[in-house]
Design a protein with these regions (language model features):
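Structural preference for beta-rich elements and adjacent junctions enriched in aromatics
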Residues: 1-206
Length: 206
């Protein structure tokens, strides 16, 4: 599976980008909300992502960044960046951005699942996560700051077409609304989104 991130000049162009659909529902699912979105590269700013979830009255109890938003109804983007010559594994550098419909983020980076680091408050502000809740759907927009990407990977190589890896998710871990949706399927017996070996190949168009 592959996903190409197109270059855009403004946030308003995001829906001209390639569509991703989160339509693989795995493990336990009380329901399966239709979720999809777009990702584009804004030069000098970062990777801009828009999610649309066709879900009314989404669970949204958490109101502060770094809260455990995965217990709410949440959309997520994970991106993995193996170093040059490094084989893709579950211990490569990757980021996870998780957002509930309050526009609250839980965002970390690091190698592997243990010992991960929260992004700084400054970068969190630059991510400019925004939510819009409608009657029968809700939307999230967020920017993965270029400053962060340059800190954790050789981003110039990425801009020149080097492959990295990504996955998009829809999740709620609370039992009354529990569900687990993926863009690229995860081959694991129990819910676990922190497995880069199952991410889709990705690139930014030159």
């Amino acid at each position: 599976m592959n996903y190409t991130i197109q270059r855009i000049s403004t946030e308003q162009d995001i829906e001209k980008c390639n569509l991703f659909e989160i339509n693989n529902y795995q493990w336990k699912n009380v329901y399966k909300p239709k979720t999809y979105g777009y990702a584009g590269y804004l030069e000098g700013k970062g990777i801009y992502v828009k999610f649309i979830c066709e879900e009314s009255n989404p669970k949204r109890e958490y109101t502060k960044d770094r809260d455990s938003v995965c217990l709410d109804s949440t959309v997520e983007i994970f991106m993995a960046f193996p170093e040059k010559g490094e084989k893709l594994s579950n211990d490569v550098m990757y980021i996870n951005f998780e957002m509930n419909s309050n526009g609250v983020m839980y965002s970390k980076y690091g190698k592997g699942r243990k010992g991960r680091t929260f992004i700084s408050e400054e970068l969190c502000a630059k991510s400019n996560c925004k939510s819009v809740i409608g009657e029968d759907k809700w939307e999230i927009t967020v920017t993965i700051p270029e400053e962060l990407l340059r800190e954790i990977c050789d981003f110039d190589s990425i801009l020149n077409g080097e492959t990295f890896y990504c996955n998009f998710y829809k999740i709620a871990e609370s039992p009354e609304v529990e569900h687990y949706g993926t863009f690229s399927p995860i081959e694991n017996e129990t819910p676990n989104f922190h497995l880069p070996i199952y991410f889709a190949q990705a690139n930014i168009e030159k």
